Amino acid sequence: MPPKIDDYFIRPAAEDDVDALFHICLVTADAGADASALYSNPRLPGYVWAVPYLKFAPEFAFVLAKHDRVVGYVVGTPDTASFDKALGRDWWPVVRREIAGLVPSTEKDADVLERIANPHSGTPGLEETYPAHLHINILPEAQSGGWGRLMIKTMLNELSSHGVPAVHLGVSPANERAKGFYRHLGFEELSHGDHLAFVMRLDKPAI
């Protein structure tokens, strides 16, 4: 695990971090910018892109903290297909009960509610060649100092230690900063239909 630097440190995520994951996911959900005004329910993005990983793949969930405050996370799964099956069985039914009666009032509401009602991959077809996937989000205050790189490296090391051969992740085409970040780390960019993905083989890691 990376050392503490300037009071920041990376640690395994814990159940007590759930609220922080919901919050960070929301305030970075607009192509890296704050999406608070785009959702009527602030937990909607986290239901999809953050919290289920802590619940169903806790070995692959890490947070960046400053003192006792969580300021970023990286979450993932070594086996996308198995993870999706577990969510279909044990996660989405719970979420649907929690948001029962919620009527979408924004375009983003509608997008996430559709995804919850009919779960689907944002990068379809990649899981056969690149079975793992991940998500990372960091608050603006902690986006310098190389912490994003260290968090990705922490995740890739964990995946590699479990024999995972390759990983993929989806990126909003509008998020130019994220695209530059992944290119710099050695990920390969793939246009996959209407989706943009970055992939890496873990038998020859670039970082």
Which residues are covered by each model-predicted region?
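Conserved N-terminal entry element of GNAT/NAT acetyltransferase domains
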Residues: 1-16, 204-207
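Conserved GNAT-fold acetyl-CoA-binding loop/helix
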Residues: 29-49, 86-96
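Active-site rim helix/loop that mediates acceptor-substrate recognition in acyltransferases
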Residues: 39-61, 67
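Conserved beta-strand in the GNAT
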Residues: 63, 69-78
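Conserved catalytic-core motifs of GNAT/GCN5-like acyltransferases
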Residues: 81, 168-171, 179, 183, ...
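Conserved acyl-donor/pantetheine-binding loop and adjacent beta-alpha core of acyl/acetyltransferases
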Residues: 81-135
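Conserved GNAT acetyl-CoA-binding A-motif
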Residues: 130-132, 159-171
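Conserved acetyl-CoA-binding loop-helix of GNAT-fold acetyltransferases
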Residues: 135, 144-158, 180-184
